[in-house]
Amino acid sequence: MAKRIGKILLGIFAAFLVLIVGYVAYMQIQYYRIDDFTKLATENPQTEQVQKGKAYRIMTYNIGFGAYSADYSFFMDTGEMLDGTKTVGKHARALSEKAERENTEGSLNLVKSQEADFIFTQEVDEKADRSYQVNQREIFQKGLSGYGSVFANNFHSAYLFYPFLEPHGAVQAGMLTFSKYQILENTRRQFPVSDAFITKFTDLDRCFLVSRLPVDGGKELVLIQVHLSAYDKGGLIRAEQLALLNEVLAREREQGNYVIAGGDFNHDIAESIESFPSGQKTPEWVYQLDSDDLADGYRFAKAENAAEIPTCRGADIPYEKDVTYTVVVDGFIVSDNIEAKAENIDGGFLYSDHNPVVMEFTLL
């Protein structure tokens, strides 16, 4: 009897081991990174050209794959209350398909209300279990039909069977750049990313999207959409990413181009680490960037209301004003031949864990 039980237990263990090995092999087979310098086509291309001396509006908004309503928390986020209580997010997927669609439409309407000439959006799902297969890319492109657009994939993962009771699943997601003006070409540049055994299967395939627009007089307006790493202990990968971005910024300035780099920097870019009332301690992931960290001739266009309106909330707990930690991590870098004025938009974190940022600018 004992031998029989032992054989059964051994068989169960062997089957479990086969499943684990098979799953790891599946993840490894599915794993890849997109090549650097990948050219991307503009969909619905526009023909009007950008002009010097004319005022334009550009917007950036991380829509959080349509999951982050105010009552949402994300399983990978951790934190700590001021009294020392540890916190961790609960969910790996949107609360429901209905919530997903409501948040996506809410984000789209918020974007449309700003009437920007150029739009950067991050965490846009194209086909993902976490967003119930709601195609946010298609929804945004249809909703912004008067713009040319380009999509850069920066998250393509095999099926992640974790958390076990609510698996994150498979993901195809990325960034969308929209423009009412002619784009000459788009290039997806690869950021340095971690190749650690587990992390490489779960982290984004980080990139920045470079779009070149012709300007009267022979120069170019170079729009660079970025989404830097967040879950990077010690900030080493983020430092490498910033170094590469600075190389590109310096090269474009040498050529006399106009440059705007914007998006989700996952760093405090407005000296806002302790600007906003909070019942939580400052998260470990919050690092600071300022204009001194950028290539010569560049600056962060700090929003005039940066001390009043944050752009990002902690996702380890649902959002509650003056309780959940908030900070400014979204915005724009501009070259010194651009006049710019930015504003953080108070979206109340209703549809995303981010608020949009809008910048008015003029090419000098």
Give residue spans per PLM region.
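N-terminal, active-site-proximal structural segment of metallo-dependent hydrolase catalytic domains
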Residues: 3-142, 153-162, 166-172
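A well-ordered secondary-structure block
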Residues: 37, 156-220
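Solvent-exposed loop/turn segments at secondary-structure junctions
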Residues: 63-66, 124-128, 154-158, 183-184, ...
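Surface-exposed cleft-lining segments at the edges of enzyme active sites
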Residues: 90-96, 124-128, 191-200, 227-236
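Metal-dependent phosphoesterases centered on the DNase I-like endonuclease/exonuclease/phosphatase
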Residues: 232-336
